[in-house]
């Protein structure tokens, strides 16, 4: 099996770590070798969270610059910040709904999302951008952004995982109250 390197970025509270865990669990259930790591920013909602999932015969979960096969971004600014991990062949899947950082005593200037997407498109050949927050709200699960992003990943990339293994990982790791909406 070829190695598949998935770099996942977002901000605290978006479910990045749980999403990476679900990919890893699905891989393990199928006997696919998997290595994972995560880096947390601030210990509160809004800090940067990075996860890596490497499927296949790799020796390390570290994804070097220009080596990600997939960049899965739960927040558009974080997609741009992680662009060093991408190359021309990387698939970028990004949520377009920004999480504007909290700045005590002031407000933050957030660049237009169209400008962020243009930065992504200038480096990689394939960018899939959509409002995952809106999709999760329409599905009746306001906390389901991570599941929407996983669905986009599974639909857009050639993953070595079966639908059954992915669904079982959701059942095993998801909150019982949201399992059904996460599976749909």
Q: Where do the PLM segments sit?
A:
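Active-site cofactor/cluster-binding pocket
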Residues: 1-184
């Amino acid at each position: 099996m070829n190695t598949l390197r998935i770099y996942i970025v977002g901000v605290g509270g978006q479910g990045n770590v749980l999403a990476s865990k679900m990919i890893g669990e699905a891989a393990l259930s199928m006997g696919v070798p998997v290595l994972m790591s995560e880096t947390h920013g601030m210990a509160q909602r809004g800090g940067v969270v990075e996860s890596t999932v490497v499927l296949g015969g790799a020796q390390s979960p570290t994804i070097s610059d220009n080596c990600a096969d997939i960049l899965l971004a739960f927040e558009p600014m974080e997609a741009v910040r992680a662009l060093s991990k991408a190359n021309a062949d990387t698939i970028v899947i990004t949520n377009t709904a920004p999480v504007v950082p909290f700045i005590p005593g002031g407000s933050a200037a957030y660049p237009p999302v169209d400008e962020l997407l243009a930065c992504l498109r200038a480096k990689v050949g394939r960018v899939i951008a959509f409002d995952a927050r809106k999709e999760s709200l329409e599905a009746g699960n306001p906390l389901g952004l991570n599941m929407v992003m996983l669905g986009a990943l599974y639909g857009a990339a050639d993953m070595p995982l079966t639908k059954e293994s992915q669904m079982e990982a959701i059942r095993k790791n998801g909150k019982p109250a949201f399992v059904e909406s996460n599976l749909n």
